Amino acid sequence: MAREECKALLDGLNKTTACYHHLVLTVGGSADSQNLRQELQKTRQKAQELAVSTCARLTAVLRDRGLAADERAEFERLWVAFSGCLDLLEADMRRALELGAAFPLHAPRRPLVRTGVAGASSGVAARALSTRSLRLEAEGDFDVADLRELEREVLQVGEMIDNMEMKVNVPRWTVQARQAAGAELLSTVSAGPSSVVSLQERGGGCDPRKALAAILFGAVLLAAVALAVCVAKLS
């Protein structure tokens, strides 16, 4: 029961962190807006809530001295996956903080990154400035407050990582994977039967008969070329 609960929490954290990563990549671009910043705020807060719940659940289980060896190995794998996910979340939050400070919404004089928007410069600039001025006051307070809150949350995530390492000592290099690299590509959950067959065919070894036929064909081709050169010289 505890294992399934931890897996569900970790799966939700992975999806939320991936969503946050894609949103961070658009900060400072032509799609940047107050709606994007608000969505970033909601997503990172959801990720932190899931991280706190996952950390508390895994910590309680791994600190149980009566845990069986096979169960402990499974929870240690979940712990390593959770630790890596938290590292990625912290890195994306720091990136969002840097980009948010470099491209503030409350300072329209600082142009955003151009990502393919085209048109007459005077008309585009006039429309952009008029639209910006209408929302300047509404966006200014949110932008500044969100950056301050994000800075505090980055420190909190860093403290969470430090506390994790102090409470539970699970070196990443001691945890062994249960599946070989790329084994998920053959899973019937993520791929249909036809995809599995094609992957198996492409992943199989070289057929000796085909290799021999290719060698013979190459030899015949070289002989034909040599014969053609000789005939050309004699003529």
Curated annotation (Swiss-Prot):
Top-level division of the source organism's lineage: Eukaryota
GO cellular component assignments: membrane; neuron projection; rod photoreceptor outer segment
Membrane topology, as annotated: Single-pass type IV membrane protein
Ranges that cross the membrane: 211-231
Segments on the Cytoplasmic face: 1-210
Coiled coil: 29-54, 144-169
Ranges in the topological domain labelled Extracellular: 232-235
Region (SNARE-like): 153-200
One GO process term, biological-process aspect: detection of light stimulus involved in visual perception
Compartments where located: Membrane
Assigned keywords, A-Z: Coiled coil, Membrane, Sensory transduction, Signal transduction inhibitor, Transmembrane, Transmembrane helix, Vision
Family affiliation: Belongs to the RGS7BP/RGS9BP family.
Disease: Prolonged electroretinal response suppression 2: A form of bradyopsia, an ocular disorder characterized by prolonged electroretinal response suppression leading to difficulties adjusting to changes in luminance, normal to subnormal acuity and photophobia. PERRS2 is an autosomal recessive form with onset in childhood.
UniProt subunit comment: Specifically interacts with isoform RGS9-1 of RGS9. Component of the RGS9-1-Gbeta5 complex composed of RGS9-1, Gbeta5 (GNB5) and RGS9BP.
Physiological role: Regulator of G protein-coupled receptor (GPCR) signaling in phototransduction. Participates in the recovery phase of visual transduction via its interaction with RGS9-1 isoform. Acts as a membrane-anchor that mediates the targeting of RGS9-1 to the photoreceptor outer segment, where phototransduction takes place. Enhances the ability of RGS9-1 to stimulate G protein GTPase activity, allowing the visual signal to be terminated on the physiologically time scale. It also controls the proteolytic stability of RGS9-1, probably by protecting it from degradation.
Protein name: Regulator of G-protein signaling 9-binding protein
Taxonomic lineage from the root: Eukaryota, Metazoa, Chordata, Craniata, Vertebrata
